[in-house]
Amino acid sequence: MARRPFAIVILAALGFMRPALAADPIRIMILDGQSGGPYHAWRLTTQVLKKELEEAGLFQVEVVTAPESGGNFAGFKPDFAKYQAVVLNYDAPDWPPDLQASFEQYVKNGGGVVSVHAADNAFPNWRAFNTMIGVGGWRGRTENAGPHWFYRDGALVSDTAPGAAGSHGARLPFQVTVRNAEHPITKGLPKVWMHAGDELYANLRGPGQNMTVLATAYSDPSNHGSGRDEPMLMVLSYGKGRVFHTTLGHDVPALSCVGFMTTFQRGTEWAATGKVMQPIPASFPTANTVSYRVDVAAMDPAFKNGPR
C-alpha cells in the first residue's frame, strides 16, 4: 500500500497561553516511575503530559512517582481517592497485592483511568488491570491474555489464533479513522486525521470486555504492520470507573501532535467526569496534514527537525 502524501503544519507557542485554572478543577494524578526500556523516556514525557493537561485550564495535576521494579513498595501507598482520574505513564511488570487491590477498588468505586501508549505493556499477569485496559502487548503476553482485536468491514472483530501480543514498525505519520463519532471524546473530530510520526501499535491482545473502539489506524505491511485496522483510541468501563486507552504517544514529538493533545485532554476529562466540555481546536489535523506544536516538541532535548 503506497503511503499517502501529507503536509505538516507547525504551530508556535503564541496563542497557547495557559488559561486561568477552573474554580473547581478536576484532580488528576499522573503516575510514572518505570518503563520496559530506555526507549520510553517517562521522565520527559510526564512533563509533556502534565503541560498539556494544565494548558486546558480544567485540571489540577500532581505527579506521583512509584519505586522501580524490585524497589521498596512498603511505603508507597498512593491515596488514589484524592483524584478523579489517574493517568498512567507507567510500565511495570508487577505490583504488590495490596497495591493492586487498592487500585482496583478505586476504579470500581468510580475512579477514572487514562492509559497512555506503553502503559498497556504493564502488568501482564494482573487480570483486573488487563480487563480495565481491554488490550495490551509485550511482556510475555500470548493467546492466554485474550484474542487480538481489530476492525474489519466496519466492525470490531477478534482473532484467537495463537501468538505473541504487540508489534509496531518505524515511527512514521499515519492516518487515524474515527469509528465512533458520537462519543463525547471524538464528537466533532474529523472522520480521518493525520497523526505525527509515532509507533503504530498492532497485534495487541486482551479480554476486550466492555470495550468500545473510538478510532483505528491501518497497520501497513510495508512498515512491518499487520495489514489490519488496529485500535488506537478505546473507552471501557470497570465497575463504576471509566477508562480511556490511547495507544498513541511514544515520544515527545508524537505527544506534540495536536491530534494526540486534543484526544488526550478530552479523554482525561471524560474519564474523570463522564463528559467533555473542551472544544476542538481550529489547528486540529486534517486527513492529509500533520499539525504539531513546536514548543512542545522542543521539550525533547534531541528535537531538531520536528515530528516525522
Where do the PLM segments sit?
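N-terminal secretory signal peptides that target proteins for export/translocation
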Residues: 1-3
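Bacterial N-terminal signal peptides
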Residues: 5-18
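Extracellular ligand-binding/catalytic regions of CAZymes and related secreted enzymes
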Residues: 23-26, 43, 55-56, 78, ...
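Helical hinge/lid and interdomain linker segments adjacent to catalytic or ligand-binding clefts
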Residues: 27-123
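Short, solvent-exposed loop/turn segments at secondary-structure junctions
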Residues: 35-36, 93, 120-122, 191, ...
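Catalytic beta-strand/loop cores that center a nucleophilic Ser/Cys/Thr
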Residues: 54, 60, 82, 152-239, ...
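A glycine-rich, often tryptophan-bearing local segment used as a flexible ligand/cofactor-contacting loop or short
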Residues: 93-184
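Structural detector of well-ordered beta-strand residues that form the stable sheet scaffold
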Residues: 112-114, 214, 244
